[in-house]
Amino acid sequence: TPEEVQAHLDHGDPYVIRQKMPLVGETTFYDVLHGSVTIPNTELEDQVLLKRDGMPTYNFANVIDDHLMRVSHIIRGTEFITSTPKHVLLYEAFGWEPPVFVHLAPVMGRDDATGKTSKLSKRHGATSFDDLVKMGYPAAAIVNYVALLGWSPKTTNQEVFSMDELIEAFSIEGLSKSPAVFDYDKLGWMSGEYFKAM
């Protein structure tokens, strides 16, 4: 009740500030790869905007920062699709136009012992750019290989690209909804192509 709330405030009890989610209906947003995505509002929890210490939560600060920085595209993993309606509702509450959303499939690694794939992690080997460079792979070959993970140029079957060619050929619409598997043999082949060209 309002009286109980006031009593807690008068007592100095810590509290959070939440955004009240709609109790009925659905929230729909458009994703470049997945099309129209609709989540029932009953699946959305009232999200915390300000923590007990008065600091904003990541999701709250992120939406504000993206708006103030004029971010045009939010490109992130598919695991964030279910939280996107909360962001959309925040944009609506502020009266702001949401950015373009693109949710990418994860890059997978293959377990050599079982042949099964799972989200790429350190157990699959080197996972950072620097680790791969230290292993002897040319930086340009790594960039070229990673660019082709989950993306296919629409106008060519070319596999070896200069940076300028990648920039020219890239389009979000060429991204795949399906997870790509990181393949060290393919990276080795790509590196060989770069070494031959030196």
Locations of regions flagged by a protein language model:
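Catalytic adenosine-cofactor/nucleotide-binding cores of aminoacyl-tRNA synthetases and other
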Residues: 82, 94-198
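Active-site cores that bind ATP or allylic diphosphates and position pyrophosphate for catalysis
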Residues: 1-103, 108-120, 128, 153
